[in-house]
Swiss-Prot record:
GO terms for biological process: positive regulation of transcription by RNA polymerase II; RNA polymerase II preinitiation complex assembly; transcription by RNA polymerase II. The keyword Nucleotide-binding does not apply. It holds the Pfam family TAFII55_N. It comes from Saccharomyces cerevisiae (strain ATCC 204508 / S288c) (Baker's yeast). The modification Phosphotyrosine is found at residue 99. TAF7 interacts with BDF1. The 1.2 MDa TFIID complex is composed of TATA binding protein (TBP) and the 14 TBP-associated factors. One copy of each TAF1, TAF2, TAF3, TAF7, TAF8, TAF11, TAF13, two copies of each TAF4, TAF5, TAF6, TAF9, TAF10, TAF12, and three copies of TAF14. Residues 1-65, 325-453, 489-579 are annotated as: Disordered. The keyword Transcription applies. It is found in: Nucleus. Transmembrane segments: none annotated. Residues 1-10, 42-53 have a biased composition (Basic residues). This is Transcription initiation factor TFIID subunit 7. Functions as a component of the DNA-binding general transcription factor complex TFIID. Binding of TFIID to a promoter (with or without TATA element) is the initial step in pre-initiation complex (PIC) formation. TFIID plays a key role in the regulation of gene expression by RNA polymerase II through different activities such as transcription activator interaction, core promoter recognition and selectivity, TFIIA and TFIIB interaction, chromatin modification (histone acetylation by TAF1), facilitation of DNA opening and initiation of transcription.
Length: 590
């Protein structure tokens, strides 16, 4: 450390004390401290400005300055300074960017965190938690850990007792920034399960999580007491710190609880710990099985004789026959059985073979019955087809005969009327087809509109429950699209209904016009028919008059003939006279 001292030179008669009336001068020292201790000490520089005393000769020497320079190195060894440990600070990460192994500013040890899931009760505080997630304000939510497994969750000044349980699966939590790539953030293997509201924090130790079990006690029920004692010992020495008063009070309850959750976080993983994951074999159990196998092998070696039989299918059938005959046989009293008794193993093998063969025979019989039923059905269908064919032939023959009769009875005269009827029927059928098409199109549009409205309501319901902003934006976009499609379908349906109404009105007008024309035609036809009837009546009257004239003439002729026959023979008339009389209608003399 360098020190500089500056002194003002005084005369020979001056004293060190200051004069009267003058202020006392302060001694000025300038010190410079070097904070960096790694710099080596530099040589000192000393300047003395005091005036020298007079020499013995009485001669006064000139004022001179004495300068001393110490350029020698400090011989003391420099002590080794211990450097402070370096703190490695991670760079500030831009929100939305995650770890990239191919980036230029790659991290040496990227951080992968572990997290827990908080599952709360579906009560009135659920909406408060959703609003906190949406707004990002978590001031009303706090978690206070009581020990490694118990915590007190406070939501909007309401305390809940919670227990940390182990999930049967490890869940990877991912996020997406561009809606295409997934980026892993952390793993989840535990869940903080809220049980019920509590009034005091001490109540959390008395809670038990539902659907939990202790896997160690479950698989080793014979040594439960020893397991519980070991757990209590572990809890007492947790982290080398003494237990709190509440933990010591509820030590046994904490140790006897189960913290292994049976289910996953989704419905398909219900009771997945027992349904899907089998327990692992303990090494002691493997040793026990090996010892038992060795014992059986030793007993097999120590046996005097070992025999085994290879059973063939034909032999099984023979044994089956013998078994069936043996069951049907009844032993008579006093007569010993000549057949030796079968062993249990043989009976078991024979019974299994009998069951298999019986099943095969039943299957064959079932196939035969099905084939017979198919044949019967085929024959029935053929008979029905033949009957229908015969009936069709008869109907066809009757129609042909009817056509011939129509031709013979003057069917040609009504050809024009038939053509008109056919044309009218064709027009009616075309109009009916158009009506059916319009009706089907209208029904199709109505069904599509109903489906869109149902989907729209379902999407709105999802939007009301969604908490993620990305999902909300997607639901909003889909709702806008569905509303546009529904509006378009409504317009199409309205246009279709209007067009159908116009067509119906046009058809009604056309039908009224056609009815008027038909009525006029019918009136004209009726007038023509009346004229024809009048002409026919006139002709009939003329014919009747002619017939009456002929009848009268014939009657007159008969009368004349009778009179001639009755007249006396003396007056004879020749043929010319008779003709003249007939011609002029003359009558004979009386």
């Amino acid at each position: 450390m360098a020190v500089i001292r500056i002194k003002k030179p005084r005369g020979p008669g001056e004293k060190d004390q200051p004069l009267e009336g003058e202020p006392k001068l302060k001694r000025i020292r300038i010190k410079t401290k070097v904070t960096d201790e790694d710099i080596k000490p530099k040589p000192k520089l000393k300047i003395n400005l005091k005036k020298k005393k007079e020499s013995a000769d009485g001669k006064e020497k000139k004022n001179s300055l004495k300068l001393k320079l110490n350029l020698k190195k400090n011989e003391e060894p420099v002590k080794k300074i211990h450097k402070a440990p370096k703190l490695r600070l991670k760079p500030i990460r831009i929100p939305g960017e995650a770890y990239d192994s191919e980036a230029s500013d790659i991290e040496d040890d990227p951080l992968i965190e572990s997290g827990v899931i908080l599952r709360i009760l579906p009560d009135i505080q659920l909406e408060f938690v959703k609003n906190s997630l949406e707004s990002g304000d978590y001031s009303g939510i706090s978690i206070k850990w009581k020990n490694e497994r118990h915590a007190v969750v406070t939501i909007n000044d309401v305390m809940y007792g919670a227990i940390l349980v182990d999930l049967p699966t490890v869940i990877e939590v991912n996020k997406s920034v561009d809606r295409k790539n997934l980026l892993k953030t952390f793993d989840v293997s535990q869940m903080l399960l809220c049980i019920r509201p509590i009034q005091e924090e001490e109540e959390v130790y008395a809670l038990e999580a539902p659907d939990t079990e202790d896997l160690v006690v479950k698989h080793f029920e014979g040594i439960e007491d020893e397991i519980w004692e070991n757990k209590e010992t572990f809890l007492k020495g947790y982290n080398g710190a003494p237990l709190s008063d509440m933990e010591a009070k509820h030590l046994k309850e904490i140790a006897l609880k189960g913290y292994d959750y049976k289910h996953g976080i989704s419905p398909p993983l219900y009771n997945v710990r027992n349904r899907r994951f089998r327990r692992k074999m303990d090494p002691n159990e493997i040793d026990y099985v090996e010892k038992v196998v060795d014992m059986l092998l030793k007993q097999d070696k120590q046996a005097e004789e070992v025999s085994y039989d290879l059973v063939d299918k034909s032999e099984l059938q023979a044994r089956q026959e013998r078994v069936s005959s043996w069951e049907n046989f009844k032993e008579e009293p006093g007569e010993p059985l000549s057949r030796p008794a079968l062993k249990k193993e043989e009976i078991h093998t024979i019974a299994s073979a009998v069951g298999k063969q019986g099943a095969e025979e039943e299957g064959e019989e079932g196939m035969e019955e099905e084939e017979e039923e198919d044949l019967d059905l085929g024959a029935a269908f053929e008979s029905e087809e033949e009957g229908s064919g015969a009936e069709g032939d008869k109907e066809q023959q009757q129609e042909e005969v009817g056509d011939e009769v129509d031709q013979d009875t003057g069917g040609e005269d009504d050809d024009d009327d038939d053509d008109g009827d056919i044309e009218a029927a064709g027009g009616e059928s075309e109009s009916d087809d158009e009506k059916d098409e319009n009706r089907q199109h209208t029904e199709l549009l109505a069904d599509e509109l109903n489906e869109l409205e149902t989907t729209l309501a379902h999407t709105k319901h999802k939007l009301s429950k969604a908490t993620n902003p990305l999902l909300k934006s997607r639901f909003i976009d889909s709702i806008k699209k569905l509303e546009k499609e529904a509006e378009l379908k409504r317009k199409q349906l309205q246009q279709t209904e209007d067009s159908v109404q116009k067509q119906h009105q046009h058809r009604s007008d056309a039908e009224t016009a056609n009815n008027v024309e038909e009525e006029e035609e019918e009136e004209e036809e009726e007038e023509e028919e009346d004229e024809v009837d009048e002409d026919e009546e006139d002709d009939e009257e003329n014919d009747e008059d002619e017939d009456n004239v002929h009848e009268r003439e014939h009657i007159q002729e008969n009368k004349v003939v009778r009179e001639l026959d009755e007249a006396p023979a003396e007056e004879t008339l020749d043929q010319n006279d008779l003709d003249m009389m007939m011609l002029f209608g003359a009558e004979g003399d009386e």
